[in-house]
């Protein structure tokens, strides 16, 4: 009897390329390999460009320009550069920094920087208007090197005073950088694809430059009344009028609604004092409605004061006074600001999210108006309190503490609306191209074109002089021949 031999078959182990997984089809795996190759190639190209001597020289020129002009750097590059080296998020070996900076004369500075690059031998240089009016971009060899933005003179002065100076370059102070990030996180109709990146940067900034205020236990979170008005009655008349008009609360009253999250030391300061800051699409109409209600309730000495916008940071607003007391400010929204809705005494009340409130409070810190200046410590303490509340409850997505709410109030400027505005301005200015306003809106400046034009003018002038010289010589020659003919030499000369 023959014994059957057992056949030992080796197990086959299928190895997958690194980007592929076992559940992928052949085609998906092939595409994954292709994408990996593309990414590797892209990384190598970026590293090569970022480390080229030409790009290093271009970056150095922008930094020297910042030192010379004392413009103030903001945005991602500013956040990155004020952080400790180990916390910086830009990879200088693979990324070319795009410098954003504020200027009091952005158009002139854009042209000046472009001229400097051209004078250094860079032929492809262009300064042009950005999407937003007041921003100008400088491109060198088709690489965006600088975004130069106009800033209201009062804001510029305040920011410059608190700027961080590193290696001779001015960087926007942390609270203003923080404000701009809170503003972006409070606009759900804006570019939400940037939110994750912004939150990461905000977290880093908060870690190394925490929001701090001094002696907040001595600071009242609400404005106190100077006169003998019936403060509690005033409070409820104004509050109810605002609720009826559907405003979004973000000032002293809104902060008082967070009192349940305050420590005992802070909680005692909250009372029914008329202290309101609100958002309304038609602030003048809203303020007039409040004044009308106040007069009905016997408060005759009322006054409304209009304040202009401060750049694009603090919107146009109206102050409501009763006697000598300021009881409310009504602001026009500058974007679509998010809010949460809660119930108070059976009424729906809109309260700004903490991100919205912080964006306004931190902006107010940099204004020079007296009514903001006298309350700077209060604003900073309120901002610190709200910031601490948000940090401790940042995963609590309910009630007042809900973050990244999609409900928002106001009109958000879109790319389409900005382009429509530019198209309208072009139609208005197209026949006035020499007008400074046209250049302000539609700058397209190429130093090479200017140089070529100057050469052409010189050539035309030279040609004109040459023609004039030839014409003069012909006239002299003709007069000479005429003279010789008259004197009898003509026959001899032309025989």
Describe the function of each predicted region.
Residues 2-7, 70-78, 82-83, 92-95, ...:
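Compositionally biased low-complexity segments enriched in polar/charged residues
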Residues 1-57, 165-233, 455-467, 473, ...:
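N-terminal regions immediately upstream of nucleotidyltransferase
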Residues 55-107, 233-284:
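Active-site nucleotide-donor binding segment shared across nucleotidyl transfer reactions
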Residues 61-66, 113-121, 238-242, 290-298:
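Hydrophobic, Leu/Ile/Phe/Ala-enriched alpha-helical segments that form helix-helix packing faces
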Residues 116-157, 293-338:
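Conserved catalytic core of two-metal-ion nucleotidyltransferases
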Residues 17, 145-227, 326-454:
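Active-site and adjacent loop segments of nucleotide-processing enzymes
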Residues 107-112, 284-291:
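Short, conserved charged micro-motifs
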């Amino acid at each position: 009897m023959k014994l059957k031999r057992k056949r030992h078959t080796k197990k086959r182990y299928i190895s997958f390329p690194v980007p592929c997984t076992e559940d992928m089809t052949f085609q998906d795996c092939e595409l994954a390999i292709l994408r990996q190759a593309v990414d590797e190639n892209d990384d190598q190209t970026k590293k090569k460009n970022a480390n080229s001597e030409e790009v290093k020289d271009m970056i150095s020129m922008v930094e020297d320009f910042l030192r010379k002009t004392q413009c103030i750097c903001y945005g991602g590059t500013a956040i990155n550069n004020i952080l400790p080296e180990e916390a910086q998020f830009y990879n200088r070996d693979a990324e070319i920094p795009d410098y954003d900076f504020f200027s009091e004369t952005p158009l002139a500075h854009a042209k000046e920087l472009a001229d400097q690059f051209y004078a250094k031998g860079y032929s492809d240089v262009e300064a042009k208007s950005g999407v937003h009016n007041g921003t100008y971009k400088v491109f060198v060899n088709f690489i965006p090197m600088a975004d130069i933005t106009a800033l209201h003179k009062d804001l510029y002065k305040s920011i410059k005073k608190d700027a961080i100076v590193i290696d001779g370059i001015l960087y926007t102070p942390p609270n203003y950088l923080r404000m701009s990030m809170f503003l972006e996180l409070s606009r759900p109709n804006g570019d939400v694809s940037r939110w994750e990146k912004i939150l990461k940067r905000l977290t880093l900034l908060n870690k190394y430059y925490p929001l701090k205020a001094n002696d907040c236990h001595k600071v009242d979170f609400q404005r106190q009344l100077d006169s003998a008005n019936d403060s509690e009655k005033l409070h409820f008349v104004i509050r109810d009028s605002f609720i009826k008009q559907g405003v979004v609360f973000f000032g002293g009253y809104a902060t008082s609604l967070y009192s349940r999250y305050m420590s005992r030391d802070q909680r005692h300061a909250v009372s029914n004092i008329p202290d309101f800051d609100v958002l309304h699409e038609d602030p003048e109409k809203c303020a007039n409605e409040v004044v009308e209600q106040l007069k009905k309730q016997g408060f005759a000495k009322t006054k409304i004061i209009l304040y202009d916008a401060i750049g694009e940071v603090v919107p146009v607003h109206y102050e409501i006074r009763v006697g000598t007391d300021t009881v409310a400010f009504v602001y026009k929204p500058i974007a679509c600001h998010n809010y949460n809705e809660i119930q108070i005494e059976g009424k729906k009340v809109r309260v700004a999210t903490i991100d919205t409130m912080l964006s306004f409070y931190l902006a107010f810190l940099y204004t020079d108006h007296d009514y903001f200046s006298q309350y700077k410590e209060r604003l900073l303490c309120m901002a610190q309190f709200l910031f601490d509340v948000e940090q401790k409850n940042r995963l609590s997505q309910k009630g007042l503490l809900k973050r990244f709410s999609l409900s928002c109030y106001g009109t958000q400027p879109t790319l389409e609306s900005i382009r429509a505005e530019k198209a309208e301005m072009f139609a208005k200015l197209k026949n006035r191209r020499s007008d400074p306003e046209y250049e302000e809106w539609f700058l397209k400046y190429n130093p090479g074109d200017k140089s070529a034009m100057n050469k052409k003018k010189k050539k035309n002038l030279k040609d004109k002089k040459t023609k004039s010289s030839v014409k003069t010589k012909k006239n002299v020659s003709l007069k000479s021949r005429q003279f010789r003919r008259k004197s009898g030499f003509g026959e001899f000369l032309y025989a």
